[in-house]
Amino acid sequence: MGTVLSLSPASSAKGRRPGGLPEEKKKAPPAGDEALGGYGAPPVGKGGKGESRLKRPSVLISALTWKRLVAASAKKKKGSKKVTPKPASTGPDPLVQQRNRENLLRKGRDPPDGGGTAKPLAVPVPTVPAAAATCEPPSGGSAAAQPPGSGGGKPPPPPPPAPQVAPPVPGGSPRRVIVQASTGELLRCLGDFVCRRCYRLKELSPGELVGWFRGVDRSLLLQGWQDQAFITPANLVFVYLLCRESLRGDELASAAELQAAFLTCLYLAYSYMGNEISYPLKPFLVEPDKERFWQRCLRLIQRLSPQMLRLNADPHFFTQVFQDLKNEGEAAASGGGPPSGGAPAASSAARDSCAAGTKHWTMNLDR
């Protein structure tokens, strides 16, 4: 690099003073500046140009110095970052403990320097189970022919006894009972039973008894005392229980007495099994004296209240009474029917069965 100095007449003219005298010669630079090649003191121009030329190198030098400082600080930071060791655990190292145990075992096995024999280590001997000792001997051997106790090994243990199954106790398991009957069939069975019980009434027929029953039920429906018919299989079983326990054939000498006793049973059945709270007395009363009617009701209540309550609470007892009612019709069919009026009874039973429809009532209970 070098400095080029150009001279022109204008510059020389400008450099002259007004008096025509030339400007003073510039002072020579010092020896140090010459050694630097003339860069030590740059020429001073108009308007302070020399000062700006002096400032530019200083800016460059400061930038280079800043870069060097930044690089040096970065190196120091990298050098200061060291891996921190893990804190030592409070307990001993398991690997060290294992090595120590191995060394102790080796020292115990090796004989000491002064001589002597090391004691053998105790080794557990496996025990053979009894089942494994009774395996088959090899072919050609005579171990199988040895009797027990001759040194051939212990005999195999006897097999455990088989559990004995107790024989079924008769009557212990419940017996399934299936009873199926329709409303018309049960009405006919009830009529047959009353006709056989009242043997003194020769002109009585099952249809007449069924007519009394249907007349009371129809009257209560027409008067508005009940919304649905009372004649159902369950209610017929209840009426049969009352008639069986209250009607006495030797005490009933006329059809009027039988009708009064039968309507008393119906009144109690309606009171116990009916859907209404109370029923009128007029459809059930056929005699002028009401006292006799109430006396019969009280006697039946005192005698049969436990059985009536049991019939509603115990399904097995109900099934038994239901089966007894059905057997009454079978007994009448096998015995030839009532003593008199067999043909009218059969025709009335057929009409009742047709009126009741083909629906059957089935019970399936275990007893």
Curated annotation (Swiss-Prot):
InterPro entries, sorted: CDK5_activator, Cyclin-like_sf
Pfam families for the chain: CDK5_activator
Bias (Low complexity) ranges: 131-148, 342-357
GO molecular function list: actin binding; cyclin-dependent protein serine/threonine kinase activator activity; lipid binding; protein kinase binding
PTM section of the record: Myristoylated. The Gly-2-Ala mutant is absent of the cell periphery, suggesting that a proper myristoylation signal is essential for the proper distribution of CDK5R2 (p39).
Keyword Lipoprotein tagged: yes
Topology class, membrane: Lipid-anchor
Function: Activator of CDK5/TPKII.
Protein name: Cyclin-dependent kinase 5 activator 2
